[in-house]
């Protein structure tokens, strides 16, 4: 007891560095996507985003990201059949939507719905790489149905059936709005298709990072995606889109845009 206790830190930090927000830290690598600040821009598995947006569909891009190559016509046909066969919402999911409080935030509904889809997945106990690919295809088929069902339940509108002869974007537009077939619907579906392609992969953004952290614990696919949805909801991530949409509604028309921006700058208001 007579020996003096030395005062020293509990851990030796001489070989460690602190990086707020992980700035400058390489947390991992991705073979799926590259966000290049130079001329290359955004690349999915080596393909430039402009080429994919101009010449591919969202389904083809999803196949590319899942399997590593663009599909042949035969592979694309089989992929479409798979998604059609998986286009069903389990009864517990529909029961959940029936009791969701009116006016709930769509991201809250999607986050909770993803958990229920995980519990009801026919391969819930299988976390093999092969099963995760099948679950991913299943979710590609289920999520448009879920999003449209959540919206229509909230509005008290009847649910609409998926059409196997429509593309992914055409189906999503139809399920949400009931519009299909005419020139206006086709133009809207094309815009939606390009938007889906542009949002499909962004390398190591916040929601991808949170999903990878969750997945690194060897948990299931749905849990990792649930983490990503919770992260995406934040106003500094995907929630910024919601703020922009609200801004457009507030401005009202192009003629009012300049005045709105000037007044916002004068009041030091954040412009999204």
Q: What spans do the regions from the language model cover?
A:
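Hydrophobic alpha-helical bundle cores within soluble ligand-binding/oligomerization subdomains
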Residues: 2-272
């Amino acid at each position: 007891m007579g020996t003096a206790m030395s005062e020293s830190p509990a851990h030796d930090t001489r070989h460690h560095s602190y990086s707020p927000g992980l700035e400058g830290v390489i947390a991992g690598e991705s073979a799926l996507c590259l966000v290049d600040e130079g001329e290359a821009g955004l690349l999915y598995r080596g393909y430039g985003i402009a080429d994919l947006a101009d010449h591919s569909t969202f389904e083809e891009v999803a196949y590319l990201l899942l399997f590593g190559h663009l599909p042949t016509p035969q592979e694309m046909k089989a992929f479409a059949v798979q998604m059609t066969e998986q286009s069903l919402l389990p009864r517990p999911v529909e029961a959940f939507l029936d009791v969701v409080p009116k006016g709930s935030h769509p991201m809250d509904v999607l986050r909770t719905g993803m958990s229920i889809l995980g519990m009801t997945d026919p391969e819930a106990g299988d976390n093999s790489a092969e099963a995760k690919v099948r679950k991913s295809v299943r979710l590609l088929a289920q999520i448009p149905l879920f999003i449209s069902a959540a919206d229509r339940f909230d509005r008290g509108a009847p649910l609409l059936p998926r059409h196997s002869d429509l593309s992914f974007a055409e189906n999503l537009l139809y399920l949400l709005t009931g519009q299909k077939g005419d020139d206006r619907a086709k133009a809207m579906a094309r815009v939606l298709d390009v938007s889906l392609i542009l949002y499909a992969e962004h390398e190591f953004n916040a929601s991808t990072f949170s999903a990878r952290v969750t997945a690194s614990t060897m948990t299931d696919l749905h849990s990792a995606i649930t983490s990503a949805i919770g992260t995406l909801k934040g106003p500094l991530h995907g929630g910024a889109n919601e703020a922009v949409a609200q801004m457009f509604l507030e401005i009202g028309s192009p003629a009012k845009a300049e005045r709105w921006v000037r007044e916002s700058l004068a009041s030091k208001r954040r412009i999204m």
